[in-house]
Amino acid sequence: YAHQRFKNRLVCQRTDGGLTAALDPSLRRIGGTWIAWGSGEADREAVDSTDAVAVPPECPAYRLRRVWLSSDEVRGAYRGYANQVLWPLCHITLDRVAYRKSYWQHYVAMNRRFLETVLDELRRRPGQAVWTHDFHLALLPGMIKRVHPATVVSVFWHVPWPGPEVFRILPERRELLEGLLAADTLGFQTVSYAHAFAECARDILEAAISPVHEQAGLPLPVAQGELFAASGVCAACHMNMVDDSGGDVSIDSAWR
């Protein structure tokens, strides 16, 4: 959701995108908090004292909690490291990778911004589970676990995962893998992507991943895509997380 000014009125619009189309119906049914970057021109006007707003406007069902990013973080983390480094690398279009060391610094800073908001939500509503999404927040699971090791953290990776021969060209390959492996469950779109991630963990971190864990997602966080069906957003899985912990926080790296 994005808030805009139209003829002196504050207007809330549901944004397009696969993640919104998948998650919004689930959150309408079960409630929770969606933490997302606030990039709408009037998003700051719409929030309360906790930087949150109830959505959808016509029938509020869950909270949308905003994270405010600086212009440097948007350029360096979102447009830079996420979209010019990780996205083309994961799609193995290496000629499109535009790496700058400063991008990584901003990427770390953006993940810390989201961490601050997650920790505030966990203070306000202890015992919630956290579900993070996509390549913009690969460091966040590890950051959360260092502060709240008992918090259930799950991840769904919405793009391909390359094999170790490609992924190892990243200078920050270890940090990214360690951040993701801190999660309790890690889901991919296909079984082959899960296998590729497992190979990277073995090759780069020398991690021990058994075939059972790699296939079933137990307890090491490598799961088949079927466990987190992207098209249906796995309402059942999301419900299980809520039932286990008494609440949930759904984190989208940014997208409203």
Predicted regions, residues:
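Catalytic cores of carbohydrate-active enzymes across secretory and cytosolic contexts
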Residues: 1-256
